[in-house]
């Protein structure tokens, strides 16, 4: 699964002020982490995120490009926080993620950019690849 899609979804869902204070706090923490890590190298990143959260459709491409150019999709902490935020939002308001959490939770789905070294993945629980 594309990490930028996950990050954008988390920002859109949680930034829309839907749900509990914990979700709003999670959004603020994710946004802050992204800007802290990548804001200096991408001066328009904050504006792109804020525009996207306010109105997703016209601002999706600029926000996606800014996040990709910044390298946010390769930062595992950012990805993990986005995934957790989506899970919290889905638990608070079932269906709000449009099925994205179900896709993330599905067997065999990995939200990651690059995996270095060997990978052993068991799909059926047997312990056999």
Which residues does each PLM region occupy?
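Short hydrophobic alpha-helical membrane-entry/anchor segments
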Residues: 14-29
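Short amphipathic alpha-helical segments that predominantly mediate membrane engagement
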Residues: 1-8, 27-108, 112-129
